[in-house]
């Protein structure tokens, strides 16, 4: 299989974790942000995870510099455009980019301006490249419940205009789900689709709760459903798609190597999986490389690839019209 040339669907990709190193250097200079060095390799060390990373919390520290750089509309528009551009070059036909609007208000932008800027970058890229994109608005679990209401209130105005879903992200604690039951009910009623980061660390029950209490249609990662039989069976029976990011899971020590990752086992047991990068820069990987690693490890064939692709199309939050077009890309 020529994996580079095959069409791809990416459903789990964080904007601020996928910033080009050279762009970070330019923006740091433009914004007057002092770094110890502006040399490429030194700045890369600030953005890309090291082999010494020991946990998800350690991994999340790589988002500090991007947060400082993405406080102006033109900067957000640029990185959104560049992410779409990078994805298109490896034949990603559709991507759902997620980011947390409330992290970009430090220099006076409103949430409305933040969301508009990212959508503008996505739409601009669609004019130049054979790729389509939409936005998922992430809310951070270490922020207040009220902050989720704020995101819903502003974000609902962009449903059908570039925003498709809401997400809960950040550090994961056991049993985090229950306090979000009412606010996620409001999100669904406001037109948001729902995907939730859960089971990324060792808590399979979080996945079950996210589906049953929050109405999650997809799960970000879902790695640890194997340690909760009820969660495993629920995901399988309901056809919930797991947005799986093996390299990221290795980086955060969820698993130690590709051979230990359950993605292929889940796939062969008819659990719906999507393969994504999570954070292209932080994990230093693109989607073609991720597929190559999975292919080498588990010897997936074209039928496996096609099934994952079509499952990903069905699990996407885009329009039915676009889904039909995306399906045609893989019919060979």
Swiss-Prot record:
GO terms for cellular component: cytosol. Zn(2+) binds at residues 12, 14, 197, 278. One of its GO terms (molecular function) is 2'-deoxyadenosine deaminase activity. Keywords: Hydrolase, Metal-binding, Nucleotide metabolism, Zinc. The record marks 221 as: Important for catalytic activity. InterPro entries: A_deaminase, A_deaminase_dom, Ado/ade_deaminase, Metal_Hydrolase. GO terms for biological process: adenosine catabolic process; hypoxanthine salvage; inosine biosynthetic process; nucleotide metabolic process; purine ribonucleoside monophosphate biosynthetic process. The active site is at residue 200. Its EC number is 3.5.4.4. It catalyses: adenosine + H2O + H(+) = inosine + NH4(+); 2'-deoxyadenosine + H2O + H(+) = 2'-deoxyinosine + NH4(+). Substrate binds at residues 14, 16, 170. Its cofactor is Zn(2+). Binds 1 zinc ion per subunit. Belongs to the metallo-dependent hydrolases superfamily. Adenosine and AMP deaminases family. Adenosine deaminase subfamily. PANTHER family: ADENOSINE DEAMINASE. Catalyzes the hydrolytic deamination of adenosine and 2-deoxyadenosine. This is Adenosine deaminase. It comes from Clostridium perfringens (strain SM101 / Type A). The gene is add.
């Amino acid at each position: 299989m020529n994996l580079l040339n095959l069409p791809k669907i990416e459903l789990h990709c964080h904007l601020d974790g996928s910033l080009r190193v050279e762009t970070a250097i330019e923006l740091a200079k433009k914004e007057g942000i002092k770094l110890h060095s502006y040399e490429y390799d030194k700045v890369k060390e600030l953005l890309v995870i090291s082999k010494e990373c020991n946990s998800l919390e350690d991994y999340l520290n790589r988002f500090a510099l991007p947060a400082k750089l993405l406080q102006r509309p033109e900067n957000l528009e640029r990185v959104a455009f560049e992410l779409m551009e990078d994805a298109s070059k490896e034949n990603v036909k559709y991507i759902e980019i997620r980011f947390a609007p409330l992290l970009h208000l430090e220099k006076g932008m409103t949430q409305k301006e933040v969301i508009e800027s990212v959508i503008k970058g996505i739409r601009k890229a669609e004019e130049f490249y054979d790729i389509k994109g939409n936005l998922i608005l992430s809310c951070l679990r270490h922020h207040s419940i009220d902050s989720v209401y704020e995101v819903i209130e502003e974000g609902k105005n962009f449903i059908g205009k570039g925003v498709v879903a809401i997400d809960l992200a950040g550090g994961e604690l056991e049993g985090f789900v229950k306090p979000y039951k009412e606010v996620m009910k409001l999100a669904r009623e406001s037109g948001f689709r729902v995907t939730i980061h859960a089971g990324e660390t060792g808590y399979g029950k979080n996945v079950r709760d996210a589906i049953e209490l929050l109405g999650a249609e997809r799960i970000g990662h879902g790695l640890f459903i194997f340690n909760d039989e009820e969660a495993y069976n629920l995901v399988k029976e309901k056809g919930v798609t797991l947005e799986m990011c093996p390299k990221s899971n290795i980086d955060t020590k969820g698993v130690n190597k590709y051979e230990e990752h359950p993605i292929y086992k889940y796939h062969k047991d008819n659990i719906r999986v999507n393969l994504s990068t999570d954070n292209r820069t932080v994990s230093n990987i693109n989607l073609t490389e991720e597929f190559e690693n999975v292919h080498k490890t588990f010897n997936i064939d074209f039928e496996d690839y096609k099934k994952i692709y079509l499952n990903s199309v069905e699990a996407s939050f885009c329009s039915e019209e676009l889904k039909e077009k995306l399906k045609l890309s893989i019919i060979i």
